[in-house]
């Protein structure tokens, strides 16, 4: 219950049911994913994915609201994402994806990740804390540069149809997804540059068909 206790200590505005349930259930998938490796180590690969599914199933059976089930299972699924940050420098696009994937749960994900540090090794604990401080600072900088919490492609659906000369259909969704990825990779782009990239993508699609 150490993670739960540490999560509760981070609550600034009173009890947070979503955070507390996520702290309780974040490692629920470990027993099902436990493997003994040849070198003697024990692994729990993908326990966050398995745990998210188990969380959804159990909370649904307990008659929690659909919204609460969705949020808690999402936090369980994302609780390991930060650990990739400490092993190598993330690009700005990776930070954008982290924020996008967390969505309105970002603040709770911050707290859950910090509370999941249970090591007694003070040097390791301090290193993790510094790494997370660094990630939060980068997120804050990017949010100042662009409204990261409301990322949209540089062109909307009507502009896409106008530029490509096509009507509504599945291709608009595909183009929108392409432009969103472009936005995540490069940040804000001028309309002319976005239109040029869209035309280049469209030409490649037609060449492949």
Can you annotate each of these PLM segments?
Residues 57, 61, 119-209:
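Charged substrate- and nucleic-acid-binding regions of tRNA-handling and nucleotidyl-transfer enzymes
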Residues 3, 7-127, 131:
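Divalent metal-dependent catalytic cores for phosphoryl transfer on phosphate-bearing substrates
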């Amino acid at each position: 219950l150490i993670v739960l206790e540490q999560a509760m200590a981070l609550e600034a505005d009173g009890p947070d049911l979503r955070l507390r349930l996520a702290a309780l259930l974040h490692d629920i998938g470990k027993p099902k994913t436990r493997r003994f490796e040849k070198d003697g180590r024990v692994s729990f690969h993908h326990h966050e994915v398995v745990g998210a599914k188990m969380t959804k199933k159990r909370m649904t059976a307990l008659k929690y609201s659909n919204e609460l089930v969705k949020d808690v299972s999402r936090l369980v699924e994302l609780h390991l994402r930060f650990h990739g940050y400490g092993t190598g420098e993330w690009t700005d696009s990776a930070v954008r994806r982290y924020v996008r994937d967390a969505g309105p749960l970002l603040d709770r994900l911050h707290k859950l990740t910090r509370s999941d540090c249970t090591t007694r090794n003070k040097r390791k604990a301090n290193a993790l804390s510094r790494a997370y401080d660094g990630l939060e600072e980068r997120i804050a900088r990017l949010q100042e540069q662009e409204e990261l919490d409301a990322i949209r492609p540089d062109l909307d659906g009507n502009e896409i149809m106008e530029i490509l000369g096509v009507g509504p259909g599945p291709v608009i969704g595909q183009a929108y997804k392409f432009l969103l990825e472009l936005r995540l990779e490069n940040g804000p782009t001028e309309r002319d540059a976005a239109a040029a990239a869209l035309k280049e993508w469209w030409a490649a699609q037609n060449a492949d068909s």
